Curated annotation (Swiss-Prot):
GO biological process: tRNA methylation; tRNA wobble uridine modification
Purpose of the protein: NAD-binding protein involved in the addition of a carboxymethylaminomethyl (cmnm) group at the wobble position (U34) of certain tRNAs, forming tRNA-cmnm(5)s(2)U34.
Entry similarity comment: Belongs to the MnmG family.
Gene: mnmG
Chief place of localization: cytoplasm
Binding site for FAD: 13-18
SS bond partners: none
Localisation: Cytoplasm
Full protein name: tRNA uridine 5-carboxymethylaminomethyl modification enzyme MnmG
Keyword Magnesium: no
Names of required cofactors: FAD
NCBIfam families given in the database record: mnmG_gidA
Length: 629
């Protein structure tokens, strides 16, 4: 049975990757269908109720700069906002928001329902229709076929999902949802390498049974940050506190005593878990010298008593979970309302993807999110936006696009995955980026919004606001460079008290701002130097561009040298055995990875600079050198 309409792009799955993929394709004018097994759970925060953080907040800002929904929804749902690393340099500062699950889901669903060119249909997908190595549609659980030349799979943890609590396990996509068994079996038939990964979640606690007076209160920031470049503090709901407590030796003894019934330590779980978000039993085992681990007590919303104890993800049996929770200060009488669990699921080797997130072997088939081996809402959403965008570009007959490593954390994420692959759930950190001084949260719009506009992702309202901000920054930078003060100027009397050493020669306002003791706000408050910019985001941009100009210029010079390799494409079907002079190890690795550019090839472990030189000579001789898209 065939559905009566044909679609340009079909997105399978309605989590963070799927919603951004569907919205991106629809914004670009493609007739888009979002298929989900349950419309009510679109935009669901399946694990921790938070968005952003180190590296992750940078991705959220980039999604926002490209017109995505995550940051906007967070501003409407965030019940506590904090800027992490606020005392450090701008490259590593990151925004994190505690979110109300219900408000976040509602806002995402509202955005989806009001997006032009987007249809939503409730049905699980069981099969792909593939003809001559090209996907042409999908078949749902009830045998209904939908036709489309571009399919984006964002299946999360649902592919052959198996939930573990102690030594008991059962099939599930997440607690309360069925797994996607038929689709997983179909995907295993494709010529793409498959593996198993694991993630987990902590037990949820009834707030009415917690003694918060025994814990340290953690308040949000004041003034309140916003997540979206289009956001406003007035969008935020009521703000509340989180709390901090710790495990202790008794907690650790309880956990050690339950390890014989842990699915992780009894060999029941095959999949590898996230290194940077380990279960509490893994922490106790790996860091046996530590007598205590920090736990963040995070409310799940304004109208629920459920608490998310961040730091005690576990798949131990329920009785052990209850005992370990009650051993923690402030939770001696706590009641669990939902048990913690681990979930195993299929993922596919991202080295089998192009950097557009299209599979190398099946034309028109795109993967995004946990199916590619990543962990985290933000990583999934960023991939979803990119996959949905490239699916739309393909349907329109246009070249695919992915930012380079020096242009966005999204570029770092995709390059790491498609070049190096992953054996464990991949999460983003600022340390993964070589050029992080240029890849800051504050300049994500300056880096990406113009490209988003060119691609059709950015609407008129966002573009007008961005253009106005950009113009104000440029005009203010010009003013600071053009205006000067000299030692005999009348302005000196107001200025000198704010300087560590009085000026002895003529100096521009820009040079004054570059002094370590001076900041933009202080300079603008001195008589004769203001009034300056009213927009705090534009003012911040002026200050960073002035104070870090030397470092930024040096990093840009490094990038300019590296870009040549990034833009030199490699034929995907090149057999590296035909390249004389390459070692057997290099041949094997290049044939396995099938890099798309010389830059990607150079980052594969074991591929030496000498091998790259040999490869370039071979390609040039045979006229195979080309610029990548």
């Amino acid at each position: 049975m065939h559905f009566h309409e044909r679609f340009d792009v079909i997105v399978v799955g309605g989590g963070h990757a799927g919603t951004e993929a569907a919205l991106a394709a629809a914004r670009m004018g493609s007739k888009t269908l979002l298929l989900t097994h349950n419309i009510d759970t679109l935009g669901q925060m399946s694990c921790n109720p938070a968005i952003g953080g180190i590296g992750k907040g940078h991705l959220v800002k980039e999604i926002d700069a490209l017109g995505g929904a995550m940051a906007i929804a967070t501003d409407y749902a965030g019940i506590q906002f904090r800027t992490l690393n606020s005392s450090k340099g701008p490259a590593v500062r990151a925004t994190r928001a505690q979110a109300d699950r219900a408000l976040y889901r509602q806002k995402i669903q509202n955005i989806l329902q009001n997006q032009a060119n987007l249809r939503i249909f409730q049905q699980a997908v069981d099969d792909l229709i593939v003809e001559n190595d090209r996907v042409v549609g999908v078949v749902t659980q009830m045998g209904l076929a939908f036709e489309s030349p571009a399919i984006v799979l964002t299946t999360g943890t649902f592919l052959s999902g198996k939930i573990h609590i102690g030594l008991e396990n059962y099939s599930g996509g997440r607690a309360g949802d069925p797994p996607a068994i038929a689709l997983a079996n179909r995907l295993r038939e494709l010529p793409i390498r498959v593996g198993r990964l694991k993630t987990g979640t902590p037990p949820r606690i009834d707030a009415n049974t917690i003694d918060f007076s025994q814990m340290a209160e953690q308040k949000g920031d004041s003034p309140l940050p916003v997540m979206s470049f289009m956001g406003d503090v007035s969008h935020h709901p009521k703000q509340i506190s989180c709390w901090i407590t710790h495990t202790n030796e008794k907690t650790h003894e309880i956990i050690r005593g339950g390890l014989d019934r842990s699915p992780m330590y009894s060999g029941v779980i095959e999949g590898i878990g996230p290194r940077y978000c380990p279960s509490i039993e893994d922490k106790i085992h790996r860091f046996s010298d530590k007598s205590s681990h920090q736990i963040f007590i995070e409310p799940e919303g304004l109208n629920t008593t459920e608490i998310y104890p961040n730091g005690i993800s576990t798949s131990l049996p329920f009785d052990v979970q209850l005992n370990l929770v009650r051993s923690i200060k402030g939770m001696e009488n706590a009641e669990i309302v939902r048990p913690g669990y681990a979930i195993e699921y299929d993922y596919f080797d991202p080295r089998d993807l192009k950097n557009s997130l299209e599979t190398k072997t099946i034309n028109g088939l795109f993967f995004a999110g946990q199916i590619n081996g990543t962990t985290g809402y933000e990583e999934a959403a960023a991939q979803g936006l990119l996959a949905g965008m490239n699916a739309s570009l393909q349907v329109q007959g246009k070249d695919a696009w992915c930012p380079r490593r020096d242009e966005a954390y999204l570029g770092v994420l995709v390059d790491d995955l498609s070049t190096l692959g992953t054996k464990e759930p991949y999460r983003m950190f600022t340390s993964r980026a070589e050029y992080r001084l240029l890849l800051r949260e504050d300049n994500a719009d300056i880096r990406l919004t113009a490209k988003g506009r060119e691609l059709g992702l950015v609407d008129d309202i966002r573009w007008a606001a961005f253009s106005e901000k950009l113009e104000s920054i440029e005009l203010e930078l010009q003013r600071l460079r053009a205006q000067w003060v000299h030692p005999n100027s009348p302005l000196i009397h107001a200025l000198n008290p704010h300087l560590n050493t009085p000026i002895s020669r003529e100096a521009s306002f820009e040079e004054l701002l570059r002094r370590p003791e001076m900041d933009y706000s202080k300079l603008m408050q001195i008589e004769g130097f203001g009034p300056g910019l009213e927009d705090p985001l534009a003012a911040e941009q002026v200050q960073i561009q002035v104070k870090y100009s030397g470092y930024i210029q040096r990093q840009q010079e490094e990038i300019n040298k590296a870009v040549r390799n990034e833009n030199t494409g490699l034929p995907l079907h090149l057999d590296y055995k035909e390249v004389p002079g390459l070692s057997n190890e290099v041949i094997a690795k290049l044939n396995s990875h099938k890099p798309e550019t010389i830059g990607q090839a150079s980052r594969i472990s074991g591929v030496t600079p000498a091998a790259i030189s040999i490869l370039l000579v071979h390609l040039k001789k045979r006229g195979l050198l080309r610029k990548s898209a």
